[in-house]
Amino acid sequence: MRARVLVGMLTMVGFAMGKAPVARVRTCHLCLLEDPSLGCISGSEKCTISLPSPCMVITIYKNTTVRFHVRGCGQHHSYRCQERHVIYQSDYLYKADCCQYDYCNSWSSAQHQSTLRGSPGSHLGMPLSASQIKQFYQALNLSLPQPGFHAHKVSEGLESLILPPELGLSIADLRQIYLFLNSSGLLVLPWDRP
C-alpha cells in the first residue's frame, strides 16, 4: 500500500516538475503594408518581442478612410488591451490597437497570393512578387532584414518597383510613415543586425 502511495506521489511530483517553461517572448504577425482589400502587400512575416510588450495593429487613415494597416510587435508598456491611441502626423491619422497574446494581431482580410498581372481575376492588382518585395524593403532604406523567402536577383535600380496602382502612395510617403512609427515608439521595426 505504501509503495502505491509513494509511486503516486512521485508521479505527481514528476508531472509538476516537468511542466513546459512559459515562453518569455510574444510572437506577432508582421506586415509593413496591408491594404484592407488586397491583404499584406509587403510580404507577411512574424516578429517576436519580450513580454509584457504587446502585438499591435496600427490603422492608418487618410481623411476618414482606412488606407492601410501595419501589423507588428509593439513597444509601449503603457498600452493596455483594447485601448486606442490616436496620433496625427502630416495628412495621416494613426490609430494603434494592442493585444496581449501570440498572433492576436490577426489579418483583417484574406491574404492573397501574388499572381501574374493580367491573369483572370487580377483586376484589383495583387500583392507584390517576391522580387518586388525585396525591392520594396530596399527602397524604404530602413535597414530592415529581408523577408524570409528565396527570390530572383533584384535589378540594381529601384525604378522597376511598381506598387499596386490602387495604393496611391509613394515609397517616400511609406518611408515617412515607418520612420514616424519607429521614432514615436509605437512599433518595433525588425532592424537588420550587422
Curated annotation (Swiss-Prot):
Subcellular location: Secreted
Gene name, Swiss-Prot/TrEMBL: Ly6g5b
Native organism: Mus musculus
Protein keywords: Disulfide bond, Glycoprotein, Secreted, Signal
Subunit: Monomer.
Residues annotated as domain UPAR/Ly6: 26-118
Post-translational modification: N-glycosylated.
Record-given protein name: Lymphocyte antigen 6 complex locus protein G5b
Carbohydrate attachment residues: N63, N141
Superkingdom: Eukaryota
Disulfide partners: C28-C55, C31-C40, C47-C73, C81-C98, C99-C104
GO annotation, cellular component aspect: external side of plasma membrane; extracellular region; protein-containing complex
The UniProt record lists the keyword Chloroplast: no
Tagged with keyword Disulfide bond: yes
Annotated signal sequence range: 1-18
